[in-house]
Regions:
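Transmembrane helix boundary and interhelical junction motifs in multipass membrane proteins
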Residues: 23-32, 157-167
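Membrane-interface alpha-helices at helix entry/exit sites of multi-pass transporters
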Residues: 42-50, 75-76, 173-184
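Transmembrane helix-bundle signature of multi-pass membrane transporters/permeases
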Residues: 18, 48-56, 180-191, 244
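A small-residue-rich subset of transmembrane alpha-helices
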Residues: 54, 182-198, 208-221
């Protein structure tokens, strides 16, 4: 495999995934997988494993950045994470009964629509209004929404991050920065679980492709997270929306090519 060609493909895969993770808590699998499959001819199962492992550090560093800026709800994030992990298994079993193309198309289409939503109808919730909800109610909501997110994450595969962002902002009433921070915090653990299982079953991936994807995704996620935490809510909504729309269209094209 030509090293320069690999470098270019992994750079753009990592850039797209990193920006999506840092700005919107998007799963790297949605961007990296189709690029690796289309341009480097990597086995789809292994491509998802590489993408999920790239997600781990990118999400962890993004969560740290959001947490440092007090834009992370760890308590409810942990509650939701348990529900997500359990019901991901349930969703994964159900997904085995449905054509994979249907699942992939759903994930990409949802990314595109969510981007349009942030542009047309920005999330302008404040932390003050978030504080009006009781801790008990928030915990119950976190469990129920975690069940829904986990099921869809297991069913769709690369749509968990987008579902988390949609539900955290639209259902739980989180302001955008806290929603993304909490989303990447949860994704750190879900991605690690997914990557470990992929490598345990499918074996270790091509070391060069794997390392390059991890590095590029981490660098761009770090850049995006720092910018996102400094941006005004209105600017962040617009930038997040544009990135999701562009990534949604790009992934649709890559999926067609593959």
């Amino acid at each position: 495999m030509n090293l320069l060609y690999t470098l270019i493909a992994t750079f753009f895969a990592g850039m797209g995934a990193g920006l999506g993770t840092g700005f919107a808590g998007m799963s790297a699998a949605a961007v990296i997988s189709p690029i690796l499959i289309t341009f480097l001819g990597i086995d789809p199962y292994m491509a998802v494993g590489i993408a999920l492992s790239s997600d781990v550090l990118a999400s962890a560093f993004s969560a740290y950045t959001y947490g440092k800026n007090k834009n992370l709800d760890i308590r409810n994030g942990l509650i939701m994470m348990v529900s997500v992990l359990i019901f991901t298994v349930v969703g994964s079993y159900i997904s085995s009964l449905v054509p994979s193309t249907t699942m992939g198309n759903f994930s990409v289409f949802m990314t595109f629509l969510l981007g349009i939503k942030f542009i047309v109808k920005p999330v302008m919730t404040t932390k003050e209004s978030m504080g009006n909800v009781s801790a008990r109610k928030r915990a119950i909501q976190s469990v129920l929404c975690g069940i829904l997110i986990g099921f869809i994450c297991g069913f769709v595969g690369a749509g968990g991050g987008m579902m988390m962002l949609l539900i955290l902002t639209s259902v739980l009433g989180y302001e955008l920065k806290t929603a993304v921070g909490t989303s990447v915090f949860i994704m750190t653990f879900t991605a690690f679980t997914g990557a470990a299982s992929h490598f345990a079953i499918g074996g270790f991936p091509d070391a060069t492709v794997w390392i390059l994807c991890v590095i590029f995704t981490l660098v761009w996620a770090r850049i995006a997270a720092v910018f996102a935490n400094k941006a005004t809510p209105k600017t962040l909504n617009r930038v997040t929306g544009v990135i999701l729309v562009v990534l949604g269209i790009a992934v649709m094209i890559f999926s067609r090519l593959s």
